[in-house]
């Protein structure tokens, strides 16, 4: 995977409080973790009888509605809050990048539109073999743009797809993403209990996912 930039963000402070402000998702990871913990307690306390399961199911439905409201409130706080991006020499931020709460995909899994504009600041050359070039029509090639969270040692601990790039060219037998190519920013979900990973994140960077190559 080719790493193409860096994002300077504030990591979670630790401790599991639902008011903690974690990375681009703000308070959402901590609230989601609270929901999972409360749901687990209800499920564990249910006795092995039809009546107890019905009671637990009702409690979980009520819990879900309460936490959906909290997650939506926290998600809407992200609207218009720019992410400070250190783009390096590969990217240029044309307009500030931020998240905007969109909807719930299901249950308490929330979706966010990625707003703003990012484009390449120079030609980006990608290593591929001649046989790969002969067997692929690059006009249809699309590569994801990833947001990678790293711990204190620089090890990747979280990743999220925030967009994609198209418009690749073959120049002098090499695969190139030309200067000025705009990223198509997409919708990013938060629906995994990644709180423990976000607590460890100390820095975030952008990366072009080149697994397809």
Language model feature labels by segment:
Residues 1-5:
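Sec-dependent N-terminal signal peptides
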Residues 8-11:
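C-terminal motif of bacterial Sec signal peptides marking the signal peptidase cleavage site
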Residues 13-15:
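Bacterial signal peptide processing site
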Residues 24-67, 74, 78:
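Amphipathic alpha-helical coiled-coil/heptad-repeat segments
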Residues 59-119:
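Transition segment at domain starts
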Residues 111-115, 123, 182-184:
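Intrinsic-disorder/low-complexity, polar/charged segments enriched in Ser/Thr/Lys/Arg/Asp/Glu/Gln
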Residues 118-136:
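Short amphipathic, basic-aromatic surface patches that mediate peripheral association
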Residues 134-138, 144, 150-213:
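Short, solvent-exposed, Trp/other aromatic-anchored flexible loops in extracytoplasmic proteins
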């Amino acid at each position: 995977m080719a790493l193409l930039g860096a994002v300077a963000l504030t990591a979670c402070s630790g401790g599991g409080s639902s008011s903690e402000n974690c990375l681009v998702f703000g308070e959402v990871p901590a609230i989601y973790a609270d929901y999972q913990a409360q749901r687990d307690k209800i499920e564990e306390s249910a006795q092995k009888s039809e009546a107890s399961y019905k009671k637990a199911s009702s409690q979980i439905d009520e819990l879900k509605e309460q936490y959906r409201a909290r997650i939506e409130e926290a998600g809407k706080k992200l609207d218009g809050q720019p992410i400070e991006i250190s783009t390096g020499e590969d990217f240029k931020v044309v307009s500030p990048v931020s998240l905007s709460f969109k909807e719930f995909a299901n249950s308490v899994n929330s979706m966010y539109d990625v707003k703003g504009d990012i484009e390449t600041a120079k030609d980006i050359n990608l290593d591929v073999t001649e046989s790969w070039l002969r067997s692929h029509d690059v006009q249809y090639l699309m590569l994801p743009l990833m947001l990678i969270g790293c711990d204190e040692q620089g090890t990747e601990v979280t990743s999220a797809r925030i967009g994609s790039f198209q418009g690749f060219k073959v120049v002098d037998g090499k695969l190139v993403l030309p200067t000025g190519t705009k990223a198509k920013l997409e919708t990013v979900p938060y629906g995994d209990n990644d709180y423990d990973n976000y607590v460890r994140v100390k820095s975030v960077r952008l990366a072009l996912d080149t697994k397809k190559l």
